[in-house]
């Protein structure tokens, strides 16, 4: 699948910090701490991405994570306020079930998945985490699922049928 790069400078991106993890390296003189930040960015209009950053200070780790997230933007196909069809996103041991929901349902998702879906602009969706609940695996599984979504027009074109034939 060929992904064309999305230019972040043309979008009004909002950032959300998902987690900050403190890691320690034990040396002769004591512990040396470093920080790893996980950030999700999106324009609430069908574009979302995530990034990680590591540094000796929290603000620097967050800045690096935001930069990384802007490089990894994907486009999310939407039908109204929800997604076109049900899909399971998989990454490592993390599986995320994403189901379209009727208008007014809201975002039913936990933690990191909620951040991704809200910043992508999906207003009505059901999701369930199956397997690993590690934030990075959940986010990657969600983005993998969202990137594989296809609109009815795309599926019809691939099958060589009309949208009416496809939808019955």
Curated annotation (Swiss-Prot):
Top-level taxon: Bacteria
Annotated GO MF terms: rRNA binding; structural constituent of ribosome
Transmembrane segments: none
Residues annotated as domain S5 DRBM: 13-76
GO cellular component entries: small ribosomal subunit
Record InterPro entries: Ribosomal_Su5_D2-typ_SF (IPR020568), Ribosomal_uS5 (IPR000851), Ribosomal_uS5_bac-type (IPR005712), Ribosomal_uS5_C (IPR005324), Ribosomal_uS5_N (IPR013810), Ribosomal_uS5_N_CS (IPR018192), Ribsml_uS5_D2-typ_fold_subgr (IPR014721)
NCBIfam families xrefs: rpsE_bact
Family: Belongs to the universal ribosomal protein uS5 family.
Protein name, as recorded: Small ribosomal subunit protein uS5
Organism (species): Bacillus velezensis (strain DSM 23117 / BGSC 10A6 / LMG 26770 / FZB42)
């Amino acid at each position: 699948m060929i992904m064309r790069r999305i230019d972040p400078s043309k979008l009004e991106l909002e950032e959300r910090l998902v987690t900050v993890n403190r890691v320690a390296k034990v040396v002769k003189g004591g512990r040396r701490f470093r920080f790893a930040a996980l950030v999700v960015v999106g324009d609430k209009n069908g574009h979302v991405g995530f990034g990680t950053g590591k540094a000796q200070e929290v603000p620097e780790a967050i800045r690096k994570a935001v930069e990384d997230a802007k490089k990894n933007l994907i486009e999310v196909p939407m039908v109204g306020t929800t997604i076109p069809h049900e899909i399971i996103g998989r990454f490592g041991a993390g599986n995320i079930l994403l189901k379209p929901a009727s208008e007014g349902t809201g975002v039913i998702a936990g933690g990191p998945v909620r951040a991704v879906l809200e910043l992508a602009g999906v207003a009505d969706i059901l999701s369930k985490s199956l397997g690993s609940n590690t934030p990075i695996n959940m986010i990657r599984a969600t983005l993998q699922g969202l990137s594989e979504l296809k609109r009815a027009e795309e599926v019809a074109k691939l099958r060589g049928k009309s949208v009416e034939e496809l939808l019955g």
